[in-house]
Amino acid sequence: MRADCANCFGLCCVALPFAASADFAISKDAGRPCPNLRDDFRCGIHARLRDSGFPGCTVYDCFGAGQKVSQVTFGRSWRDDPATAAQMFEVFPVVRHLHELLWYLDEAMSLPVTRPIHAELRAAFEETERLTMGAPGDLLGVDVAAHRDKVNTLLLRTSELVRASAGGRASADHRGADLIGARLRGADLRGANLRGAYLIGADLRGADLRGADLIGADLRGADLGGADLTGSVFLTQVQVNAARGDAATKLPPALTRPAHWPATQPGPAAAPGRVSTRRPRPRRRRG
């Protein structure tokens, strides 16, 4: 469930739309190739995406759906076979959703505490994998929302097992909480339920997030400097890429430290904090 851009037909650069914003320098409609996409399906500005106004591209991750659709579902590129382009671009986000579920299920199966439900997790993984191998027409007929709901039941049970063994405040429930800009520096968030929480711009420097459930948490611009996320569950590369961190940030072994994170150590940590939804005064934006 890892992206292999060398075996993809540049699907994220073509199939998906984006609007001119802080994340993208230009607007692009779905189905129209990004002007930076080369003939060999590589990005012409990959090494300088962030400096060129495309940080959104460095955040995105397809969970390996790109190469699956390119090499398995179709086998020929949208350039070589233009008649398949529209369908290929429709299939891509479907497979991407399914591959995200495979990522979660694979992680859940790797955890010793989920041994009591391993058989159910394995069955769900195999069913999801079977769906990804379908023909284009079959994939477009998949009820992704219904399948996600079914898988989510197992992910919730996984979360409960992990958080119960985290050794912290496992009862801390911040599911879907508005923690935008929250001051959580040094906070003990071990075993916390942060599913779908809005942590945009939150100060999580030095926070202990071991055993926390972070599925769907919005970490855009959150400061993870010195934070400990080892043992957290359902954290994805997309979330990590969207956050800020440093050399002292501890990540789960399955995730990669983003290249745009500084390689410097943080200063002395502040005293442990408590969860607070008090937001800092807004700063005046430049430009």
Positions of predicted regions on the chain:
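Hydrophobic scaffolds flanking metal-cofactor catalytic centers in soluble metalloenzymes
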Residues: 1-119, 123-142, 147-150, 154-165
